[in-house]
């Protein structure tokens, strides 16, 4: 299987009529210096002025938010699932330090951002959803992580 061909085809998903407005909104986001607090809530903070009402508008365009919670400069995104509870339950049982970590079905990347607390060598997420990728891109625009998000499904893993 040619994964590059699959990636190119999946990139076209970003032009779908329900996704294109999200991608346009993401392209308009300002570059600001921000800090990330990785706790139960993946929280972003900045000394710079942030247009929180514009962030809320964009976040609402991206609903539903399944995994989280997130706090974007004071805008709390209360997600459908309390992913922090599951993560906190499992975290004592793994060591990610220096390891390559894959998140299969990564959704918006909540767990991948939490993984950063443990300094893994590399984090790669797999999820074939243009909406979830857009949510991830919103958060990562400010986190500025090296996380790799692949618009690939479980069926592509043997070829990765």
Task: Give the predicted meaning of each segment.
Residues 83, 87, 114, 132:
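Acidic/His-rich structured neighborhood in mature extracellular/periplasmic domains
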Residues 70-84:
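Class I SAM-dependent methyltransferase Rossmann-like catalytic core
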Residues 121-156:
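Class I SAM-dependent methyltransferase SAM/SAH-binding core
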Residues 1-61:
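N-terminal auxiliary segments of SAM/dcSAM-dependent transferases
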Residues 99-107:
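Conserved class I S-adenosyl-L-methionine
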Residues 80-97:
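Conserved alpha-helix/loop element of class I SAM-dependent methyltransferases that forms part
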Residues 158-160:
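A short acidic, Gly/Pro-enriched loop at the edge of an enzyme's catalytic core
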Residues 108-119:
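Conserved SAM-binding loop of SAM-dependent methyltransferases across substrates and taxa
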């Amino acid at each position: 299987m040619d994964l590059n061909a699959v990636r190119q085809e999946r990139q076209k998903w970003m032009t779908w009529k329900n996704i294109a407005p999200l991608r346009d909104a993401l392209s308009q986001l300002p570059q600001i210096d921000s800090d990330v607090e990785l706790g139960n809530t993946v929280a972003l903070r900045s000394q710079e002025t942030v247009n929180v009402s514009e962030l809320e508008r964009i976040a609402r365009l991206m609903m539903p938010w399944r995994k989280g919670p997130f706090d974007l400069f004071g805008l709390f995104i209360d997600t459908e699932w309390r992913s922090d509870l599951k993560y906190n339950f499992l975290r004592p049982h793994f060591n990610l330090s220096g390891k390559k970590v894959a998140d299969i079905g990564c959704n918006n990347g909540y767990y991948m951002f939490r993984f950063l607390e443990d300094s893994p060598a590399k984090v790669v997420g797999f999820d074939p959803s243009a909406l979830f990728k857009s949510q991830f891109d919103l958060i990562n625009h400010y986190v500025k992580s090296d996380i790799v998000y692949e618009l690939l499904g479980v069926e592509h893993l043997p070829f990765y």
